């Protein structure tokens, strides 16, 4: 019996029940039909629920896209409004992320309009976590524009805050050997919480370098694994830092490899661009795809790419921007390091850093470098438009870290 025949019987039963009871059809026909109808209703219900699920998912995606678009619009407005009110001197000051000076810390923040301070070992000596929170709050209160407060916190041999912790932060390599990636990520979460609790909003990690030689300068600071595992490590650490709104910095682009120490020497790296693409670029690309905030460029000279240190090389900057499609903040390694300081003067280095396309200058010579850059703007060697490009990226990073929340 077809569906339509059975449906007709059901209607007839409803309209003339006595007739059908008398004829005994109810007993023969209705029971199987009710079962048949029940299954149709179940299937129909499942189809309806599936449709509703997909509809709700589409609505959620649409809401998320609108929220993202609204957030980006809000960020752009905050950045552009702040940029429009800044003097040239304030803009140039934003290009400098400085070591905390031995004296006049508050005065220099106000006089030079610095983008922020980087804390080193001496800044933690004799302090408690509460002391550091008070100190960073004083720095923030003294600055018209919210500050980047950073500290090298890779773990192991490179950690500043560990000197005042009961349990120092270990290196990623040690953690990976002890407990795999979960141990590394657990450490990253804890580190982010501690840093944020004392007002440090950027930890200058993770190290994205590869080194095959265990005696290489950078080896102990890496996770000590191949390009694929290192890429996974970098990606996941960046994501952990994002959750806590602690800034991430991938270093040291374009990859240290097995080379010497640019703190003490000019380093020349003879690897080709193809060599770097096949291995060293992979962790950096993974970090970029995960949303890394910033990338630190080394002073190593990649002889097959350029004749100058990477930190002042337009070609290296172009690789980051165009090939790896990085949109965030590009900073230099410390300009006081011999790998650059023995190559070019401090003041000229600052100019070359910005002309190469970088955004943030790390170092301690800002008292002469800032006036030098202002002079170069006056002479036409450096344009305010070029400065604005970098300041926009720096302010956008500060917005993403939630630093403008306190000042609006």
What is the role of each PLM region?
Residues 16, 48-85, 91-93, 408:
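N-terminal, intrinsically disordered, polar/charged segments of Gram-positive cell-envelope systems
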Residues 23-39:
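N-terminal Sec-pathway targeting helices
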Residues 70, 74-134:
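DNA-contacting surface of Y-family translesion DNA polymerases
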Residues 87, 125-138, 229-375, 382-386, ...:
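Second-shell residues forming the walls of enzyme active-site clefts
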Residues 92-100, 115-119, 147-153, 203-206, ...:
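Hydrophobic faces of well-ordered beta-strands that scaffold small-molecule active sites
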Residues 100-110, 184-192, 278-283, 344-350:
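Short, acidic/polar
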Residues 140-166, 187-208, 230-254:
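Glycine-rich, aromatic-flanked loop segments that form ligand/cofactor-binding clefts
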Residues 378-406:
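Mid-to-C-terminal alpha-helical segments outside catalytic/metal-binding sites
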